[in-house]
Structures are given as structure tokens and as C-alpha cells.
């Protein structure tokens, strides 16, 4: 009897969008009932995920491997794409979150489309050949080359042919996530300055 009442209560709660139901696994023990509205559930999920993604808020070209930054940005893009499904666009609060989420997807997509393939192709070539040709000239007027595996990643990356544009676009993403996303999702970005 009690189980039936709980089931009816949950069923009507989900229909009225007072509660959200999230299936972790499709097994008997994997059913989690979360007593939150979709906007709170979504905000918590996004905050918890982004809370560990420093490079989207602050990038350090001297120590951050751009290859790993692209992986992280792609993970964020996919995470938002999947999690956005919980939002009910008929509700005002959900619609606001849907708007900022679409803005995140658009900005991430633009950066990844513009830079990811070219950088990865360049990086694969130099790592495979173990040499980076620089624009610097030696005393004979020939280009200086660096041995890939003996050079810190921060120095290697500065020789990427679109380094300045890539850094400018990373900084735009950082600014957007710091000024807009961190505010909406209540993400503590001050910790990255310590």
C-alpha cells in the first residue's frame, strides 16, 4: 500500500514537473529518484562537472597541454548536450538555463571547429617526427628546430602556426565562462587564482 502511494505521488510529481527522475543505470538497483525540480537538478549537475574543469575558466599556455584542453572542452560540449535534455523549456527558469547552455554549446562548437583539427594534425606531425621547426633563425639564417621530446610543452605550443589566434579564442572562452557561466551556475572560480 505504501509503495503504491509513493509510486502515485512520484508519478504525479513528475507530471507536474515538481520532481525529476534520473535513471543512473537500467537495473533494479540503479533507479535514483531525485526530489528536485529540473532547473535545480541541471544546475547542480553542470556545477559539479565544471567545478573541476580549470582550463575552461583559466588557461596557462606554459603548463596546459592544448591537446588535453581540447579534450576537456569536447567533454564539456558533450556533457552539456546530454544534460540539457532534463530541462523543460516551458518553464521560465529552465528556459533561462537552456539559453545559457545553448550559448555555451555555440561558443565551444565554434572554437573546436575552428582550431581543434588543425592543432591536432600539427601536434601529431611534430610528435611523430620528434621535431618542431621554429621561425627563429640560427647564425646561418636557417630555421632553428627543437627536439619535441626534450622540449617543455609550453615552448612547443608557442610554435604552432596559429598560436596567437588560438590563445585569443581560448581567452574569449575563458572570459565567457568566468563572467557568465560561473555566475549562473554558482561556480567558485577564485580557487584557480590560488
Residue ranges of model-derived segments:
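Soluble C-terminal extramembrane regulatory/interaction domains of multi-pass membrane proteins
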Residues: 100, 104-194
Amino acid at each position: 500500500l505504501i509503495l503504491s502511494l509513493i509510486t502515485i505521488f512520484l508519478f504525479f510529481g513528475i507530471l507536474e514537473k515538481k520532481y525529476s527522475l534520473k535513471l543512473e543505470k537500467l537495473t533494479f538497483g540503479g533507479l535514483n529518484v531525485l526530489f528536485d525540480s529540473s532547473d535545480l537538478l541541471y544546475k547542480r549537475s553542470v556545477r559539479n562537472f565544471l567545478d573541476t574543469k580549470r582550463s575552461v575558466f583559466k588557461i596557462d599556455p606554459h603548463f596546459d597541454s592544448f591537446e588535453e584542453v581540447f579534450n576537456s572542452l569536447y567533454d564539456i560540449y558533450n556533457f552539456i548536450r546530454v544534460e540539457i535534455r532534463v530541462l523543460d523549456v516551458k518553464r521560465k527558469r529552465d528556459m533561462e538555463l537552456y539559453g545559457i547552455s545553448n550559448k555555451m554549446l555555440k561558443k565551444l562548437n565554434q572554437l573546436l571547429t575552428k582550431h581543434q583539427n588543425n592543432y591536432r594534425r600539427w601536434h601529431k606531425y611534430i610528435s611523430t617526427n620528434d621535431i618542431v621547426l621554429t621561425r627563429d633563425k640560427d647564425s646561418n639564417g636557417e630555421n632553428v628546430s627543437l627536439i619535441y621530446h626534450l622540449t617543455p610543452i609550453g615552448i612547443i605550443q608557442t610554435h604552432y602556426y596559429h598560436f596567437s589566434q588560438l590563445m585569443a579564442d581560448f581567452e574569449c572562452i575563458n572570459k565567457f565562462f568566468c563572467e557568465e557561466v560561473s555566475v549562473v551556475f554558482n561556480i567558485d572560480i577564485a580557487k584557480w587564482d590560488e
